[in-house]
Swiss-Prot record:
Organism in which the protein naturally occurs: Arabidopsis thaliana
A Pfam family: Cytochrom_B561
Cofactor: heme b
Annotated signal sequence range: 1-25
Entry-linked InterPro entries: AIR12_DOMON, Cyt_b561/ferric_Rdtase_TM, DOMON_domain, UCP037471
Residues the entry annotates as binding heme b 2: 256, 325
Annotated localization: Membrane
The keyword DNA damage appears for this protein: no
Topology in the lipid bilayer: Multi-pass membrane protein
UniProt-recorded name of the protein: Cytochrome b561 and DOMON domain-containing protein At3g25290
CDD domains: Cyt_b561_FRRS1_like (cd08760), DOMON_CIL1_like (cd09629)
Cellular component per GO, a single term: plasmodesma
Residue ranges of domain Cytochrome b561 in the record: 184-380
Amino acid sequence: MSSSSSVRISLSFIFLALLISPAVSQTCKSQTFSGDKTYPHCLDLPQLKAFLHYSYDASNTTLAVVFSAPPAKPGGWIAWAINPKATGMVGSQTLVAYKDPGNGVAVVKTLNISSYSSLIPSKLAFDVWDMKAEEAARDGGSLRIFARVKVPADLVAKGKVNQVWQVGPELGPGGMIGRHAFDSANLASMSSLDLKGDNSGGTISGGDEVNAKIKNRNIHGILNAVSWGILFPIGAIIARYMRVFDSADPAWFYLHVSCQFSAYVIGVAGWATGLKLGNESEGIRFSAHRNIGIALFTLATIQMFAMLLRPKKDHKYRFYWNIYHHGVGYAILTLGIINVFKGLNILKPQDTYKTAYIAVIAVLGGIALLLEAITWVVVLKRKSNNSMKPLRT
């Protein structure tokens, strides 16, 4: 083998080593701090590429922490908190770090989060000191929060605290921090922290409550996608096109009613899970998605009850009832599909789910276009045959 080939191979191995080493090094045990500070316990937190180093002094119930994470975007923020009463963000006693827009220096502030609308600097419910923030350039632009916290007596007795962490893309006006994303990773960024370090060096889970909330979000999405986004369009296609064929009467009507009633029942279940999620997520509002959901439930409920008032075919009001029924039906069809896409944008599942739903809608749309052409041919041919019939004297 020539010397030039050997050099190229050696350089290739060096290049691969340089690529691999940063990925391998991103663990809590490999991190170092200024002043050679060390902490006996560290955790690779399961969400948001975050790490926690800590020590607990039982003699004075003091918890010393270093929280490290990359902001969601350059110029964003990171936060670590203890929630004395619950597991979510509301009620959290929070430390927030970001780079001051004026001078670019990392700073740390405290937030007592009573609601999602009160994200402004405020005093915590317990003492905290030695607060400092710094940028860790070697860790891909991560920020670090240093602090010592006086752990409340009731939490000391439990031996554990509920910790919450978060990252956001930007700062808001008036000293407020900007809104963070509501992806699964953001919603699952909470866990129980053992003060004695029994979970030291491990990766910890977000807890059953978080997993249940994510499961409910997925159930809500599936129920509503199937009902408003698939079954209702199928029912509309059945009503519009099958009725043209005399041989399909009255089967098309019962198929239409069965499909729409099933969609309504499933949709109500999805709507109820949405209400439950809203009640469990105080301060989190997706107004457009919520309002469309309420409108869908209202229109669909009216549509169901209107079936009880359906006039007979020869009744003088049947024409007006048909206009109402078709108008409300198409409104439900349109709003349902729009809201499914809004829900997908909120849930942010894997691209395959959104692609699959787009494929389903495309197939239904293609079937509708094909049936539209076929039924027009049938109707025009029927009219032509009727016009050619001789008049009886």
